[in-house]
Regions:
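Active-site acidic carboxylates
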Residues: 5-103, 153, 162, 168-176, ...
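Acidic active-site catalytic centers that drive phospho-/nucleotidyl reactions
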Residues: 19, 133, 157
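Secondary-structure boundary/capping motif
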Residues: 33, 113, 135-136, 162-163
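Histidine-anchored nucleotide/phosphate-binding helix
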Residues: 44-47, 137-147
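Active-site beta-loop-alpha junctions enriched in small/polar residues
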Residues: 60, 109, 157-159
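Internal catalytic-core helix/loop-beta-alpha segment
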Residues: 83-134
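A short glycine-rich beta-strand->turn/loop micro-motif centered on a GG-aromatic cluster
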Residues: 126-130, 149-164, 184
Length: 191
């Protein structure tokens, strides 16, 4: 399936790269599935940059008191502590986009400021990254709820979940909410 857009053209597509950080790739909460999507993510970012489209990174950002937070009680694994190596977006990924690319630090699964970032235009949005079943789905649904007429897609070949089963469940949830799923079944970690 290719990402299709409503007729009438658009000014610019936006790629949102969700939480592609060391702790989620091969750090505290990393997985073999996450490591296997990195090259697809880099290729996708470079394609958007080459086409003159917009790239935005999100960065899961916690404070040193993470273990005392609600999330820390339910997921007692310190991760993405601001300034730590695990919080960083690996240079291979970060350097695929221009230096002045917007990076949104978010303290929760979903970002609540999409309305001010994406404005009211109808340009399509595509999301990729980690974890499909937590932050990718949270942000895709937040964008779809804020902009119900906007084309929103997730490229599953550039995503990995906490587990393959939870990744698939998140894709189903997003499909039910009219979010287009691209490359389903073509995730590199399925090979």
């Amino acid at each position: 399936m290719t990402l299709s857009f409503h007729t009438g053209g658009y000014l610019m597509k936006t790629l949102i790269v969700v939480d592609m950080q060391t702790d989620f790739i091969d750090g505290a909460l990393g997985s073999k599935e996450a490591t296997k999507i990195v090259s697809n993510v880099v290729k996708k970012i470079k394609k958007y940059v080459k086409n003159g489209d917009r790239v935005i990174f999100t960065q899961d950002t916690h404070k040193k008191n993470y273990m005392k937070t609600r999330e820390g009680k339910y997921l007692p694994v310190p991760h993405c502590i601001k300034g730590s190596d695990g919080w960083m977006i690996p240079s291979k990924i970060r350097n695929a986009a221009p230096e002045d690319t917007l990076v949104i630090e978010k303290p929760a699964f979903g970002y609540t400021g999409w309305k001010s970032i994406l404005k009211a235009d109808k340009d399509p949005v595509e999301l990729i990254g980690l974890c499909t079943d937590i932050c990718v789905v949270s942000n895709a649904l937040a964008i779809k709820n804020t902009f119900p007429e906007r084309d929103v897609a997730v490229d599953s070949s550039c995503c990995a979940g906490v587990s393959p089963a939870s990744h698939d469940a998140a894709l189903l949830t997003m499909k039910c909410c009219q979010i287009d799923i691209l490359n389903e079944g073509k995730e590199p970690w399925r090979e």
